[in-house]
């Protein structure tokens, strides 16, 4: 296991590949990585430049078909996505790169015992699922290293989206955005949530308008204020499915194009940023 604190901020990087919600579809995830020339079919890191960063926007698990008429496509249980991205991060680090897997609302749901989107193949039984995902459980060593929010240069990444209200809550307690990652790490390692952290945990992480759940981001004026406070130009989010990657209010990129076969799509997209140029890439199933 890679033993490091959760890193919030990275320097500007010449190449960042951004992949939306995966929901257990390890095959399509690999297809994107191969299409982007991040790995080859032998899972070797071939990215150029070598220090390329891959950001996966969360929701690696919960692979139940959203349309029950879809054929069963799942070969491996959804947790294999967590293990694979953990392995890939180790491979990337050995070559100078990095794979950042964000925490999404579906990872959180599983840690609190909500398995309503888990496929029959992945569920196996409730007890085993609980032992995997519970705080201090089997997966906690991996999940405790994964951030809820990351900044790379002037780019902000989180699963559903940060708002000015979230920053105001943090400011009330003299905390910066990186503290959200600290609270998550304490929670998943089964450390007590401090009394002064309770509002941050409940309103920013657990709440339906929190950064893992919201579908109602700030209007443009407040969005710009929020980004300026963090020294950012763009925010990248997953969570809300869109037919194609799109830019909203000039500052928010929506990246979740329903990649997983659980959504029944025959094409999907990812983002490849190279030398500050944001490129939207199409993949046909």
Predicted regions, residues:
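Feature recognizes metal-dependent phosphohydrolase scaffolds
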Residues: 1-285
């Amino acid at each position: 296991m890679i033993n490091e604190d959760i890193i919030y901020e990275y320097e500007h990087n010449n190449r960042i590949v951004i992949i939306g919600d995966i929901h257990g579809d390890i095959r399509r995830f690999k297809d994107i990585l191969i299409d982007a020339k991040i790995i080859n079919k032998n899972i070797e890191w071939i990215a150029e430049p070598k220090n390329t960063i891959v950001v996966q926007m969360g929701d690696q698990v919960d692979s139940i078909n959203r349309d029950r008429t879809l054929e069963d496509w799942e070969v491996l249980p959804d947790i294999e996505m967590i293990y694979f991205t953990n392995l890939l991060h180790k491979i990337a680090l050995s070559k100078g790169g990095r794979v950042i897997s964000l925490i999404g609302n579906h990872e959180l749901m599983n840690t609190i015992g909500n398995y309503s989107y888990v496929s029959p193949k992945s569920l196996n039984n409730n007890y085993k699922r609980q032992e995997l995902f519970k705080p201090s459980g089997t997966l906690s060593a991996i999940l405790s290293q994964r951030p809820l929010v990351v900044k790379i240069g002037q780019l902000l990444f989180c699963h559903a989206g940060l708002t000015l209200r979230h920053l105001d809550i943090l400011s009330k307690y003299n905390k910066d955005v990186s503290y959200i990652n600290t609270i998550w790490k304490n929670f998943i390692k089964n450390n007590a949530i401090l009394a002064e952290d309770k509002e941050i945990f409940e309103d920013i992480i657990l709440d339906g308008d929190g950064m893992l759940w919201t579908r109602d981001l700030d209007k443009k004026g407040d969005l710009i204020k929020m980004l300026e406070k963090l020294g950012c130009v763009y925010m990248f989010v997953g969570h809300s499915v869109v037919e194609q990657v799109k830019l909203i209010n000039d500052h928010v990129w929506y990246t979740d194009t329903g990649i997983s076969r659980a959504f029944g799509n025959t094409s999907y997209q990812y983002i490849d940023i190279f030398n500050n140029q944001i490129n939207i890439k199409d993949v046909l199933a």
